[in-house]
From Swiss-Prot:
Keywords: Coiled coil, Merozoite. It comes from Plasmodium falciparum (isolate 3D7). Residues 616-655 form a coiled coil. Residues 57-73, 123-144, 170-188, 216-227, 251-268 have a biased composition (Basic and acidic residues). This is Uncharacterized protein PF3D7_1225600.
Length: 781
């Protein structure tokens, strides 16, 4: 084995600091930290084990001399024809070897120290050390030049070692150098298992140290096999055994070092030919490799990689900002680029724990890129709307995606088309195609605590959702199906939701919708599909359209209130000054009545203050009197305008009704009736006589009480079964004409009795106890 590797191993083990290794991992999470520390501990134990093995191996200097003698003998036998040349060359070799033996031992230690220091030195110190080495190499090269004789070339290297090369071998040697350089580049990328965020946190010192250690371990793992075979041959006593051992061990070692070269060439050599090809590995090639690993070469590689990554990130950000304006499919571009990079890396690298962490981080980065692209539109949407009610059905046809924890039914025309289609007409392809286009899956939330006219809340999730008004859903079959599912309390699975059936209306709880595919934004409480890119695209388009609509909409609620108040003030000003009528102004009679009430309250307050004031304080009393007089004038003006508006409204109504009656029935006027009676009739019909509001309110109250008393008396007289059935019918609000609901027994006697009772109760026939929606529609049409 080489002395260089031994010294490097010893120094790296002696200067192993736990503080330096753990300080870089403080920012990482526990799981990643433990994995990285475990890997480092394994490397440390391998190095320790290697050092123990190397301590047991003791190769004497005599064995070294015997090795070189054997190589010389093999050269002499192979080159008998060129004996004279070989003798000269061998003499040169011996002289150079003897002269540089002392320099070799000193430089080994220096080079080992330099190699270790390169990993932990700064850039300035490294430049100085490299300049010194170049000067030393120039001196040595000046003394010892390269000799080219015929086909064999003898090269003098730094340490005084000669490399014997033939013409064919020179090319292979150059190829071997190229391969080692390529392997060094690959080793850096293979061992860089962490992602860019982790690399940025690491210091430049520890980068270089880790790359050295990983490259050394890759070489040492190859040499483990040779050490295992040589364990038994450690105790060597005689010279013959030592010679044999030295020959075998060096053959094995050099065969492993030139393993890649043998792999590339298909020629099989004999043992003698192998001895000719034994190449004492030069110090220059070793130093070149170490420079690439630890010196400027590695720094250049790492700097170039970081620059490329920064350029990529900047390119992605620029493309995102550009495509926001252009409206391109940026989400797909980000996803496809990252996916290609991941696939290429997965083919090259094995799936180690560190690699899995790296993949997880990359996936997270993709999702964050997409989400960051969408955040601008999401934030603007919520700033404009300021509510979590998203009308998703307006622009995007989602089958079941609940976004913002809300469900809303809007497209009632489509809903009616779905419900009006019959299930039996599935054979006709045209009808199926039209139904699939108009089809929409509808979901109702059960488990309701409170029910307002348009909103209700879920019991389990406390979600407020909007309900479509039931008067607009004008089909009986639709409500029958809803009632049946309500009785069953059916819980729907994902498979049923995804099924492509023809007739689909469901009721389900929010809890039954699975949240596995959703990612929740904790800041805005939005649920988004992070897997399906189509959903993200459609949601993004929806947000853009909604933002444009909301930006075009100028007024908020406060602004509308301000506008309404301004209109009121202008209209009242015109009434007071120009004596304009209410009908010509944008004000209703209710607003005028409210204004009168508010003015009356102010007058009452002023009168109360007037009573409290002293009689001697004439100034305040005069002020109060003036204010009261002005307000009373305003009230009188408003009341006069109100009376005029009411009379005009009544006259308009009477004229319309009178015209309709004339067209319907044209009766002859009676000549015998007196004119006074005619006037009274016309005045009553036209509503000329003024009636007090209190009189009308009393009349309405009396009618209500009489009706309630009549109903309660009839309900008490009825049997309990009929009572329960009627109440059940009104509470459920079922819309159907089914005898099974009301009549349990098939006997006609009971039917007749019940018909008579219901006729007494409702004043209707037995078959027409409930009016259908179809009848209502006909009446309204």
């Amino acid at each position: 084995m080489k002395k260089d590797e031994k010294n490097n191993m010893d120094e790296s083990l002696e200067e192993y600091d736990e503080e330096n290794y753990t300080s870089e991992l403080d920012d990482l999470p526990e799981y990643e930290r433990e994995l990285i520390l475990a890997k480092r501990h394994e490397e440390y134990m391998k190095k320790k084990h290697r050092r123990m093995l190397l301590k047991n191996l003791h190769i004497d200097e005599k064995s070294k001399g015997n090795i070189h003698d054997d190589t010389n003998k093999s050269i002499e036998t192979s080159n008998k024809r060129k004996g004279k040349l070989n003798n000269k060359k061998l003499k040169l070799k011996k002289k150079l070897y003897e002269s540089d033996e002392e320099e070799e031992n000193d430089k080994n230690d220096k080079n080992d120290d330099d190699q270790y220091d390169n990993t932990y030195q700064s850039d300035e110190d490294r430049k100085k050390s490299n300049n010194k080495k170049k000067e030393q190499s120039k001196k040595i090269k000046g003394d010892n030049e390269s000799y080219n004789i015929d086909s064999i070339s003898y090269v003098k290297y730094k340490k005084g070692k000669i490399k014997i090369l033939e013409d064919d071998d020179e090319k292979n040697h150059e190829d071997e150098k190229k391969k080692t350089d390529i392997i060094d580049h690959v080793s850096v990328t293979d061992d860089s298992y962490t992602d860019s965020s982790y690399k940025n946190k690491k210091k430049s010192k520890y980068k270089k140290g880790d790359t050295n250690q990983t490259d050394k371990t890759s070489k040492k793992n190859k040499n483990d096999k040779t050490n295992k075979t040589n364990k038994t041959n450690v105790s060597i006593k005689t010279k013959k055994h030592r010679e044999d051992y030295s020959d075998d061990s060096m053959d094995d070692y050099h065969s492993t070092s030139s393993y890649e070269h043998e792999k590339s060439s298909d020629v099989h050599y004999n043992k003698k030919e192998k001895k000719i090809q034994l190449k004492v590995i030069s110090e220059e090639s070793h130093l070149d490799n170490t420079k690439n690993k630890t010196g400027k070469g590695l720094n250049k590689i790492l700097i170039e990689k970081e620059k490329k990554k920064k350029k990529k990130d900047l390119h992605i950000v620029d493309s995102v900002h550009k495509n926001k304006e252009d409206g391109k499919n940026v989400i797909t571009d980000i996803f496809e680029k990252n996916e290609k990079i991941n696939k290429d890396k997965e083919l090259e690298l094995p799936q180690t724990p560190e690699r899995l962490i790296h993949l997880y981080k990359e996936e997270k980065k993709i999702k964050m890129d997409i989400y960051n692209y969408m955040t601008y539109d999401i934030i603007t949407y919520f700033q404009l709307k300021k509510t979590f009610l998203l009308d998703m059905c307006e622009h995007v046809h989602f089958s079941y995606h609940v976004i913002g924890h809300m469900i809303k039914i809007i497209d009632i025309s489509k809903l009616n088309k779905v419900t009006n289609q019959d299930v039996q007409n599935t054979n006709n392809k045209k009808k199926i195609d039209t139904a699939n286009e108009n089809k929409k899956k509808i979901f109702f939330i059960t488990n309701v605590i409170k029910s307002e006219p348009y909103f209700s809340t879920d019991r389990n999730t406390n979600i407020k959702f909007e309900v479509a008004h039931l008067e607009n859903l004008a089909h009986s079959k639709f409500f029958k199906k809803i009632k049946n599912i309500m009785y069953q309390n059916k819980k729907i699975s994902m498979d049923e939701i995804k099924s492509n059936e023809y007739y689909e209306t469901y009721i389900c709880d929010m809890n039954n919708i699975s949240d596995q595919k959703f990612t929740i934004d904790e800041y805005n409480h939005i649920k988004l599909f992070s897997i399906d890119l189509d959903v993200l695209k459609t949601f993004h388009l929806f947000l853009k359209e909604k933002n444009e609509d909301l930006k075009n909409f100028r007024y908020t609620e406060k602004q509308l209130q301000d506008l309404f108040e301004k209109k009121k003030q202008k209209s009242f000003y015109e009434i007071y000054t120009n004596n304009k009528s209410i009908d010509n102004l944008p004000i209703t009679r209710i607003t005028v009545q409210r204004e009168i009430c508010s003015i009356q309250r102010e007058i009452d307050k002023l009168n109360f203050d007037k009573k409290k004031t002293n009689v001697n304080d004439t100034y305040t009393l005069s002020k109060l009197n003036n204010q009261i007089n002005e307000l009373t004038k305003k009230i009188n003006i408003l009341r006069g305008n109100l009376d005029k508006a009411r009379k005009n409204h009544a006259a308009m109504k009477s004229n319309d009704q009178f015209a309709q009656e004339k067209n319907m029935t044209k009766e002859k006027s009676r000549t015998n009736i007196k004119s006074t009676q005619k006037d009274d009739a016309t005045n009553k019909f036209l509503g000329v006589k003024e009636m007090d509001i209190s009189y009308f309110s009393k009349q309405i109250y009396d009618e209500k009480t009489n009706f309630n008393n009549m109903l309660s008396s009839k309900f008490i007289n009825l049997p309990l079964d009929v009572h329960h059935k009627v109440v059940h019918h009104f509470l459920l609000g079922t819309i159907q004409n089914n005898d099974a609901v009301f009549y349990d027994d098939p006997s006609h006697k009971i039917k007749k009795e019940l018909d008579a009772e219901i006729d007494k109760l409702l004043g209707l026939h037995g078959n027409r106890h409930i009016t259908l929606f179809d009848d209502i529609k006909k009446n309204y049409e």
